[in-house]
Every structure is written in C-alpha cells, then in structure tokens.
UniProtKB/Swiss-Prot annotation:
Belongs to the aldo/keto reductase family. Disulfide bonds: none annotated. It comes from Schizosaccharomyces pombe (strain 972 / ATCC 24843). InterPro entries: Aldo-Keto_reductase, NADP_OxRdtase_dom, NADP_OxRdtase_dom_sf. The active site is at 52 (proton donor). This is Uncharacterized oxidoreductase C3A11.11c. SUPFAM superfamilies: NAD(P)-linked oxidoreductase. It comes from the Eukaryota. The keyword Lipoprotein does not apply.
Length: 334
C-alpha cells in the first residue's frame, strides 16, 4: 500500500466526483453511507474537487463539510485530495498566484476549516503559466500550513521533471485503466517509479465501460446527458473497445471475478503498491462491488493473461513514445 506524504492510504481510494457532478446529486444519507463504508474498508484517500457540481460548483466540498461535521471522528482518518484552480464557466485551469490563492481560500472556507487540505493540485497543467511559478506558489501554502502537500494532474514527463525541480511532488493523478494505458507508453509511469512518486489512477473503471453497466450506445449517451463533462467515453471508443471488453468479461468469469473487480485488480497488480485506483460510486451497491477486489488480486499468470488479452484486442496509442513498461502480478496484497 502506498504512502502519500507519510500517510498510509489504502490500496484503493474513493473518487467523490460522481456524488455531486450530476443533475441529481446523491442524497446525503446515501452519500454518507458510501463514504463510511469505503473508509471502514480501508479507502482513506478521498479525491474531491472545488468545481465538482453542475448547478452549484462547490457542491462536492459542501457535501464533505456536512459529512465531517456529522462524523468528526473521520477527519483524521481521511487523506483529502482536492483539485482546484479551475473555472467551470470557461473550462480553463489557471495556475497563477492570484487564482491559486483564491482557490485555496475558497476550499478552506467551504470546508469551514474543519478538515485540512491534505493534498492540493490544480485540475490540470496551465499551459499559459510556467509550472515553476505554480509550484513555487503552492510551496508557500505548504509552508504556511494551508495545505499539506502538492500533487500534479495529468502532467507530461517534462512537466513532472520541471515541477519536481522546484518542490517535492507527493502524488500524480493520471487517467489509467485496462482500456487506457497511455502512461505505460509515454514514460510517465517509469519516471514516477524512478522518482518514488505514487500514481493516483482516476477513471479506473473507464467511465462505466469496465463495470458491465455500459453495454449499448444508448448507455453512452445517457452518461453524457446526466454527467455534463467531456470525460465520458465517446461512442467511437465504445465500439472500438467492445471486442476487448467482451474478452475481459470472459477472463473475469474464469477468475471468479466481476469485470469491475478485474479492472481494479489489474491496476493493483500493475502498480505493485505504487498505483492507487480511485473508483467512484453513486450507490452503496456499486462501492461494495468495487471493493471486492481487495481480496481478489491477480497472480502472475493471470496478470500476464490479461496483458496478452489487451495486446491482442486493443490497439496501443497511435504514437507511443516508448515501449510499454508493464510489470506486475502478485499473489498477495501489495
């Protein structure tokens, strides 16, 4: 299990986005049930966003504020990661001192200063602000105690190196799943391993494609309708990966796993304790199903069989920068 800023987080984290980034946010009673279940089963890394709401951008943080006020014993048990510095109106990330200062102030005030921001990261890399300036600004907030450590979201290899030269990077969030293995080709996974930086894998279930719940084009369109963001899988992605998904379902059945359990177990095996998947859930049943992968880790042979399946049924990135660096498989929880 990875340590982030000397905090031992469970092998699987919890993404909170889907609780509020929807036309019909999950009611508090159900949301709190999901959060408490996850925490009681070792999911201590929680991923939140300053802008994770449709009608109310601060809905995600407001949910957390209500949760921690109702369950104060959970405050010190949760490692809270927050994305910020994103303008939901322009869909732009701003890594300037002015915007970061405003963002961190907003997050702390919305949380009512009940819970410290354990890890803060801009929601993406701002192409218009030198990353060295952004990191230097964030370091000042670490020094002042407003945030405890700094992360990066979807950086390139060069951006990681530049940021790392300014300040210690505690974690890096990337898009990673069985269907999206870009970090194995572009050097990010290898560099983070070399620098001992844990990776946090968002969308480990490929926006529903690896849960078995998304089976038709209509399901894709329904996701787009109710979750208004550009991260939902396009129809072209679904059609091109359908043969792969069917093959993975067969492997999951062979291993006595659900497709979601296979998807998360693959990441745990590929990361060997250095990649933390953060699935999200909109119901108690879904989070319960996801956490079944705690006890179902792929052995070396099974992991190799999954990799072979992926290589046969799923094309690699169009222009990979390197050969895939896929290692993994273990007989016990890492």
């Amino acid at each position: 299990m990875p340590y982030i800023n000397n905090f031992l987080v469970g092998p699987i984290g919890l993404g909170l986005k889907s609780l509020t980034w929807t036309e019909n946010p999950v009611p508090d009673e159900e949301a709190f049930r999901i959060m408490n279940y996850a925490l009681s089963h070792g999911c201590s890394f929680w991923d939140a966003g300053e802008f994770y709401g449709l009608s109310e951008p601060l809905a995600n943080l407001q949910l957390l504020s209500r949760y921690f006020q109702k369950f104060p014993d959970s405050i010190d048990k949760v490692f809270l990661s927050v994305k910020g510095a994103f303008d939901p109106e322009t869909h732009r990330v701003h890594g300037t001192r002015e915007c970061i200062t405003k963002s961190i102030k907003t997050v702390r005030e919305t949380l009512k200063k009940v819970k410290t921001i354990d890890l803060y990261q801009c929601a993406a890399i701002d192409p218009d602000t030198p990353i060295e300036e952004t990191m230097a600004c964030l370091k000042e907030f670490v020094d002042s105690g407003d945030i405890r450590c700094i992360g990066l979201c979807e950086p390139s290899v060069e951006e990681i190196k530049r940021a790392h030269s300014v300040v210690r990077i505690a974690a890096i969030e990337v898009h990673y799943s069985m269907l999206f293995r870009e970090i194995e080709y572009n050097g990010v996974k290898k560099l983070c391993h070399d620098l001992s930086i844990p990776l946090v894998a968002h969308s480990p279930l490929a926006h529903g494609l690896l849960t078995g719940r998304v089976t038709t084009m209509a399901d894709i369109e329904n996701l787009k309708k109710h979750h208004q963001c550009n991260e939902q899988p396009p129809s072209s992605t679904f059609s091109s990966t359908l043969p792969c998904i069917q093959a993975l379902k067969e492997l999951a059945s062979k291993y006595d796993m659900s497709l979601a359990e296979l998807a998360l177990s693959f990441i745990l095996s590929a990361g060997r304790g250095r990649i933390l998947p953060i699935p999200s859930a909109t119901s108690y049943d879904l989070i319960e199903a996801s956490l079944g992968s705690f006890s179902k880790v792929l052995d070396t042979y099974q992991f190799a069989e999954v990799v072979s399946c992926l290589e046969k049924t799923l094309p690699p990135p169009a222009s990979p920068n390197s050969e895939p660096q896929v290692t993994g498989g273990c007989s016990s929880m890492c």
